[in-house]
Amino acid sequence: MKKVFLIVLFSLFIVFLNFTINSCSPEEKIIEKQMIQISDEELIEKNSAIYKTREINGKERKFLSSDFSRIEKPSSLDEFTQYFHNPPLRQHRTGTCWSFATTSFLESELKRLEKGDVKLSEIYTVYWEYVEKARGFIKQKGKQSLGQGSEHNAVTERMKKYGAVPASAYSGLLRGQEEHNHSKLFREIRNYLTFCKENKYWDEEKAISYVKSILNKHLGTPPETIEVDGKSMTPKEYLENVLQLPLDDYVCFMSLKSLPFYTKGEYKVPDNWWHSEEYYNVPLDEFFDAIVNSLKNGHTVALGGDVSEPGISSAEDIAIVPTYDILQKLIDQDSREFRFYNRTSTDDHAIHAVG
């Protein structure tokens, strides 16, 4: 049975448009109309847009948000059905949500598959993703996006090539460090690869060796062997013989009108820097049903979405679709497509849905 990664383009995917067709006599031209019924309550209970401030890089910045004071929200996570997941970890000052979310998903899968409670290293995968990203940049002679972000299926692809290790074997933190911060690390990688591009220096072996030296300086050298239950093994042996994750069973879905439905194609966002075309494209109702049915049947789901919308607040721990943005009944395949097309909404964060 296939398990799923699901790429959610933004937080407005949860409600759909109902369709009705006008009745007409045979001689009349048939016209299909989309009818939307909006109740008085929905017009009254509108949300207010307000400006808030927060500190970004030491400076106070204004940003558009919502007034959440009148919104009723659940009082506790105990109100929800939850499946096993390890406690959430902070990615701190890194762009590695893709690894943290997907690693958490795979840990939940290990528990579901009766492999026990396992805590894997997110940064081990990040290390090799940065290496592969640099390799791609050199191979493409600089014609490739370069950032810390990536996609869910990068984790499974890097595991297939480099294996996996427990978090205890590789933290990605140097002695005395308590928080991840890849700002300086990635700046050094970017500066070096920019130098390569400007000087047309495309020696892949030497370039990757230098990038690894930067990574080793900031993250520590990843282990070539690890010890598990008294046995020494490589990261690939740990993945294949101990974890035994069915990595080929995990697939990506998206819902976009730019590609024919029921085909596979490329998810065109910067974080899909290697132009993976392994995304199954399905209509929005089936896309949504896949999420709901997975959760109802005991599977957790790795999601990609937009958390920079004004209806989302981490401080309030709440997410809504504000009425000043778009009424929920107007959200459908087309409105979603329009927002993705004009970049109002995009894919800027990965999360793990656990119930």
Regions found by a protein language model. Give the residues of each.
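Positively charged n-region of N-terminal signal peptides that target proteins for export
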Residues: M1-V4
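Short amphipathic alpha-helical "recognition" segments used for binding
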Residues: L6-I7, K111
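Bacterial N-terminal signal peptides
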Residues: V8-N18
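Bacterial Sec-dependent signal peptides at the C-terminal "C-region" and cleavage site
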Residues: F16-K29
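Catalytic-core signature of thiol
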Residues: P26-V354
